From Swiss-Prot:
Family statement: Belongs to the anhydro-N-acetylmuramic acid kinase family.
EC top class named in words: transferase
Gene name in the database record: anmK
CDD domains the UniProt entry points to: ASKHA_NBD_ANMK
Alphabetized UniProt keyword annotations: ATP-binding, Carbohydrate metabolism, Kinase, Nucleotide-binding, Transferase
The protein's name: Anhydro-N-acetylmuramic acid kinase
EC number: 2.7.1.170
Family matches, as InterPro entries: Anhydro_N_Ac-Mur_kinase, ATPase_NBD
Binding positions (ATP): 14-21
Length: 377
């Protein structure tokens, strides 16, 4: 691989808690290029700690601090494996953009805040690579929701002058970026993506996810439960809006199920797929345009064939594709986005879109942790 100063590594672990995505991006050309990408499973013990924290909202300072340290070490280990696998030296990488792990996101509280953990000091010290992290709080300091941040990257890569493009990311939470010509970009969370599906099958079958949606396909959608789920006030909020596991979790689902105790677990799973699909479709149906409509899907939800089939069936006016068709692996769009955000930060360029987050202005995002190699690392 050539020597370069335009290689950036993006590191992302999302609300699905399945693992850590790494993407090596090259920004030396007008069109950013994904060079390598890999996935590293989340260790079960760390996954459980994060899940418990997100679902309960309570912990001790000791436990939170130790989890912050553990995640910093985990990200470091993933990066070092990635460098070794692809025969890269730290000197070839300009910077790492590490999102961290969101454990709480509360943009509408009296004192708005968001918390991502995974100590970037450890990453910079042990890799010897400048690291950019803490991307969301600067946007919130300027009055924004702190999310979603990826639409700015979507705009840079996917916006076209002659078509209505929407990028749909289905991770733990689903979010869309509306990229319409001659309009401000709008991007926001639509509701749950995989998080409820994964939590429900883990509870009943001990599996991390519903492979090929086989369990969901064995069930039937319960329209009464679906109506109760869609009655959640979040779905009626105007954009921009953001949400996370602090709302859509097993506690929320169990409360909704109190009126539906006779349902089979697989019927609940089928209904949760429909919830994800319907909450996405409800937002897309608000778009009025005479242009060709293209929906580009990315994230783990691309692998849910039932969800993809439902989106295609419910959106006959849209051409439903994946970002693979546009040259960017659907599994690694978010990781690539945080590499791009690190590039933007080091070049003092904006990383947010006020029309998306609600911030007062476009600003560069992220705190910089300069490379200072720990020789004992």
């Amino acid at each position: 691989m050539k020597e370069a100063t335009m290689y950036y590594i993006g590191v992302m672990s999302g609300t699905s808690l399945d693992g850590v995505d790494l993407a090596l991006m090259d920004f030396s050309c007008a069109q950013p290029q994904l060079i390598h990408a890999d996935f590293y499973p989340m260790p079960p013990a760390i996954r459980q700690q994060i899940s418990t924290l997100c679902n309960s909202g309570t912990t001790t300072l000791q436990a939170l601090g130790e989890l912050d340290h553990q995640l910093g070490l985990l990200y470091t280990d993933c990066i070092q494996q990635f460098l070794q696998k692809h025969r890269l030296s730290p000197e070839q990488i300009t910077a790492i953009g590490c999102h961290g792990q969101t454990v709480w996101h509360s943009p509408n509280s009296h004192y708005p805040f968001t918390m991502q953990i995974g100590d970037a000091n450890l990453i910079a010290a042990k890799t010897g690579i400048t690291t950019v992290a803490d991307f969301r709080r600067k946007d919130m300091a300027f009055g924004g929701q702190g999310a979603p941040l990826v639409p700015a990257f979507h705009q840079a890569l996917f916006r076209k002058p002659n078509q209505a493009t929407v990028v749909l990311n289905v991770g733990g939470i689903s979010n869309i970026s509306r990229l319409l010509p001659n309009e401000e970009v709008i991007g926001y969370d639509t509701g749950p993506g995989n998080t409820l599906l994964d939590a429900w099958i883990e509870k009943h079958q001990g599996k991390a996810y519903d492979k090929n949606a086989e369990w969901a396909k064995s069930g039937k959608v319960n329209t009464d439960l679906l109506a109760d789920l869609l009655d959640e006030p979040f779905f009626a909020l105007p954009a921009p809006k953001s949400t996370g596991r602090e709302l859509f979790n097993l506690a929320w689902l169990n409360k909704k199920l109190q009126k539906h105790t006779a349902l089979l677990p697989q019927d609940v799973q089928a209904t949760l797929v429909e919830l994800t699909a319907q909450s996405i479709v409800d937002q897309l149906n608000q778009i009025e345009t005479e242009l060709d409509r293209h929906l580009l899907v990315c994230g783990g939800g691309v692998k849910n064939c039932l969800l993809m089939a439902r989106l295609t069936a419910l959106l006959p006016q849209w051409q439903v594709q994946t970002t693979n068709d546009y040259g960017l692996d659907a599994d690694y769009v978010e990781a690539a986005a945080f590499a791009w955000l690190a590039y933007q930060r080091l070049n003092d360029l904006p990383g947010n879109l006020p029309s998306v987050t609600g911030a007062k202005s476009a600003v560069s995002l992220g705190a910089i942790y300069p490379k200072e190699k720990d020789v004992a690392a």
